[in-house]
């Protein structure tokens, strides 16, 4: 059993301005990018320094290093990533390409205005008791959980597997393909709730 505890949330703007960021956010864990009040993330990532990694993400959007969806509101239901006859790169600005009349910058501003980042801590449990892990073992478990979440979203939402790269992410978990029994909990201060049916 693995528990994923969402312990903090922050808006993209607040993270850039470093407003009330707890020290724990700079540690190892899984994080999620959510648009507006969506119940599913458009990005899942892991890092040893989640706060620093997410600031890098936001700067990469500004610098045109990532694919950028032309209409960020489509990140609410992820329809722009569904694997069907309508799936197309035309829904995105490609990395490094200039958009017409500042459209890229407008899309990034809209994204940042409505983007929430959730920070989660992964704990391996045995009979309900946390298992002590080395840093290397903990990183491996976190990577396995990231990959499992990504795979479940692809399967249950019929997403094109390339959606992971479209949002700046790497393939989670290396070569590991381990299915953990997952539980999802939240701190009282976190108001965003994700749809567990797409993962668990």
Segments the model singles out, each with a brief description of its role:
Residues 1-42, 48-200:
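Boundary/linker segments flanking structured domains
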């Amino acid at each position: 059993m693995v528990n994923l505890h969402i312990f903090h949330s922050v808006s993209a703007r607040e993270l850039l301005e470093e407003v009330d960021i707890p020290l724990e956010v700079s540690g190892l864990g899984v994080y999620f990018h959510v648009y507006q009040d969506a119940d599913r993330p458009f990005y899942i990532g892991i890092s040893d320094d989640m706060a620093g990694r997410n600031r890098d993400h936001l700067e990469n959007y500004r610098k045109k290093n990532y694919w950028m969806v032309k209409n960020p509101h489509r990140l609410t239901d992820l329809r722009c990533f569904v694997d069907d006859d309508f799936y197309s790169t035309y829904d995105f600005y490609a990395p490094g390409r200039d958009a017409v009349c500042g459209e890229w910058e407008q899309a990034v501003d809209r994204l940042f205005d409505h983007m929430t980042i959730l920070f989660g801590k992964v704990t391996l449990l045995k009979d309900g008791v946390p298992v002590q892990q080395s840093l290397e073992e903990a990183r491996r478990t976190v990577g396995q959980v990231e990959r499992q979440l990504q795979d479940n979203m692809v399967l249950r939402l019929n997403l094109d597997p390339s959606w992971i790269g479209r949002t700046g992410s790497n393939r989670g978990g290396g070569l590991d393909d381990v299915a953990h029994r997952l539980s999802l909990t939240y701190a009282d201060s976190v108001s965003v709730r994700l749809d567990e049916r797409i993962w668990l």
